[in-house]
Amino acid sequence: QGKQYFNENGENVKKAFLRAPLDFAYISSHFNPNRMHPILHKIKAHNGVDYAAKRNTPVKASGDGVISFIGKQRGYGRTIEIKHGGNIKTLYAHLERFNSKLKQGSKVKQGDIIAYVGDSGQATGPHLHFEFWKGEIRTDPVKVKLPSAKPVNISQKDDFDNLLQLNLNKLNQYNLKKNG
């Protein structure tokens, strides 16, 4: 699973979700319940964030989860939905293409490449439309309070505490030698 980093309380310093699941140039459209739609020319809620990026820029899974939808959705074009624990779902739309290894039911980890930026569906140019759902409510991915990743496993907490104390003692000895 790679390296993980924890604070002195055993809490993971990494978040459970990536706020922006790709390398992007700028935000071309913010979360806005009263946005003027650029193609339909009428007020229509924009329930996500549009990250402008070059076509075929890799799109990563924002967090660990299971692909609950992969295919085309009206307006969104090529779309992926991922269900995460805690009643959270993320949506990725206007994609150029999907990672060919993925299908509905595939498990993904945070940072896995799931697709590539495009302009499928009703889009004015290449970008990722990204939504973050809590239950049935869409929230602003830029402003939502993201949960931390899992803390130190309870079965490893004693070992973690012992290692922490050992390293704190070493730091204190070093500081005493340096300043003493």
Predicted segments with their positions:
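Intrinsically disordered, low-complexity regulatory tails and linkers that flank structured modules
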Residues: 1-5, 161-172
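Catalytic cores of peptidoglycan-degrading enzymes
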Residues: 13-166
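Buried, small/hydrophobic-residue-enriched core segments of structured protein domains
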Residues: 1-11, 15, 19
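Short, solvent-exposed mixed-charge patches
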Residues: 177-180
